[in-house]
A protein has these predicted regions:
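An acidic/polar, Gly/Ser/Thr-rich interaction patch typically located in mid-to-C-terminal regions
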Residues: 1, 100, 107-112, 141-223
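Intrinsic-disorder/low-complexity loop/linker signature
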Residues: 8-9, 82-83, 119, 162, ...
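Short amphipathic beta-strand/extended segments with alternating polar/hydrophobic composition
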Residues: 14-20, 132-139, 164-165, 180
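Residue-level recognition of well-ordered beta-strand positions that form the cores
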Residues: 3, 34-36, 215
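Short, surface-exposed beta-strand/loop "edge" segments at domain boundaries and coil↔beta transitions
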Residues: 7-10, 42-44, 123, 129-133, ...
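Charged- and aromatic-enriched interaction segments used to assemble
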Residues: 27-145
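Short, acidic/charged, Gly/Pro-enriched secondary-structure junctions
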Residues: 1-25, 53-65, 217-223
Length: 223
């Protein structure tokens, strides 16, 4: 826990997370520890290739196998775009671990997974609303790009035909997110795959930011 002193003098207790020690080295004056969060637990082999279910079913299977609690509720995942669609793993795939499965499930849901401060697996979405303003006096250096990053198309490769299926907004004048060969996006009619990909695109299209590098005063309350 980090005890953060706020501007009004009050103290905010900021949990820094849950970690597992993987290596300990005793030095002359201290004990050096190397630790990782619970995401490392998902580097276990996945053998549920016969699984058929919704995104939540795949997540729950991985969490149970790797002994990590899932922070999101089933109703929350089912309500997301593509959350209620029945998925299955295409036979020819490059899935080796549960972490690979989570990567592809996150793609389908248009989000990403993290291990939160309570040590639970959590699905998050890309936001569009500012959460904090960092004043110039709090920045030691800054370097801003001269373009805006935004996505107006997605590309998903059909494993059977080896053809990249392209879906775009109108106008299509932004970046394209390449989904590669996602084993969960292979089955069903072309119309079904298009629906899944367009739902992913709808989630990605909210992303709009200017890439930058900056050295600032650290704030452990920010994720």
């Amino acid at each position: 826990v980090f005890h953060l002193v706020l501007a009004d003098g009050s103290v905010e207790d900021v949990p820094m997370g849950v970690f597992e020690v993987s290596e300990a080295n005793r030095l002359a004056k201290c004990l050096e520890l190397k630790a990782y969060d619970f995401m490392l637990r998902f580097d276990r082999s996945f053998n549920g290739f016969e699984t058929v279910g919704t995104a939540y079913d795949f997540i729950a299977l991985c969490c149970k196998r790797c002994k990590v609690e899932f922070a999101n509720k089933r109703a929350e995942i089912d309500a997301m775009p593509n959350g209620g669609v029945t998925l299955s793993v295409y036979t020819e795939n490059d899935i080796e671990t549960c972490r690979d499965v989570l990567f592809y499930v996150a793609q389908v849901l248009g989000g990403f997974f993290i291990i939160n401060r309570e040590g639970k697996l959590e699905l998050r979405k890309y936001g569009k609303d500012p959460v904090m303003k960092v004043e110039q006096r709090h920045r030691f250096s800054s370097s801003f790009s001269d373009f805006i990053t935004r996505y107006t198309a997605v590309s998903s490769t059909n494993k059977q035909t080896q053809i990249a299926e392209y879906y775009a907004l109108d106008p299509d004048n932004g970046l394209t997110m390449n989904l590669g060969v996602n084993p969960l996006l292979q089955f069903g009619l072309k119309e079904t795959r298009e629906m899944l990909c367009r739902n992913i695109l709808a989630e990605l299209s909210v992303i709009r930011y200017v890439p930058f590098d900056s050295d600032t005063i650290g704030n452990p309350a920010l994720d």
